[in-house]
Amino acid sequence: MARYTGADCKRCRREKTKLFLKGSKCDTPKCPIEIRPYPPGEHGRGRTKDSEYLLQKREKQKCARIYGVLEKQFRGYYDEANRRAGKTGDELLKILESRLDNVVYRGGFAPSRDAARQAVRHGHVQVNGRKVDIPSYRISENDIVEIAPKARELTPFIVARETAGQGRAVPAWLEVIPSQLRILVHSLPARQVIDTQVQEQLIVELYSK
């Protein structure tokens, strides 16, 4: 599957906000967007007034980059959200949050969603006792996500276990048992408990044209 291979920090600067693609570095003064809070390139400091279309497109790109999803798959998620009974923007974020790589990241078992994707692809993650190596696998209510027994002594997971509770907060819809490297999915999140800083209505407006 195709993936973006450019510099992560340039993506954050392009969107003029932190996308939290580099793990703990994003929370330090070394984060490039703290040093250079303007887009990369020769004309990055220039003042331009974005059109309505560009604002909508940038918001879609920002959301897709946060969750590490390329355009074709992102559009598929939007189409699915649009068929659901709830508000399309809310449903889109619920779908993105229910991805396995996101749940591994939210549970604190990886410093970034990219690292979580790698852990899943390498077969280090189980769902309900079975190995799942597809990052886009959709988690359901009452699922149990855990690090596979053979992987629990790998350095990233030792660190995750020993530093549990010291980093970002685990969302209320998940319960983490650090000693077992296990995540209990109590529910799927409502929009009001999703802290992703995106204006999903702009995405809906873009795709509705």
UniProtKB/Swiss-Prot annotation:
- Show the GO MF annotations: rRNA binding; structural constituent of ribosome
* Short name of any one Pfam family annotated for the protein: S4
InterPro entries to which the protein is assigned, alphabetical: Ribosomal_uS4, Ribosomal_uS4_bac-type, Ribosomal_uS4_N, S4_RNA-bd, S4_RNA-bd_sf
Sorted UniProt keywords: Ribonucleoprotein, Ribosomal protein, RNA-binding, rRNA-binding
Superkingdom, natural source? Bacteria
Q: Which cysteines are joined by disulfide bonds?
A: none
Q: Name one GO cellular component term.
A: small ribosomal subunit
The Gene Ontology biological process annotation of the record reads: ribosomal small subunit biogenesis; translation
Q: Which part of the chain is the S4 RNA-binding domain?
A: 98-164
Signal peptide positions (record): none
The record's family statement is: Belongs to the universal ribosomal protein uS4 family.
Q: Entry's PANTHER family?
A: 30S 40S RIBOSOMAL PROTEIN, SMALL RIBOSOMAL SUBUNIT PROTEIN US4M
Please describe the quaternary structure of this protein. Part of the 30S ribosomal subunit. Contacts protein S5. The interaction surface between S4 and S5 is involved in control of translational fidelity.
Any idea what job this protein has? One of the primary rRNA binding proteins, it binds directly to 16S rRNA where it nucleates assembly of the body of the 30S subunit.
State the name under which the record lists this protein. Answer: Small ribosomal subunit protein uS4
Q: Which organism is it from?
A: Frankia casuarinae (strain DSM 45818 / CECT 9043 / HFP020203 / CcI3)
Annotated gene = rpsD
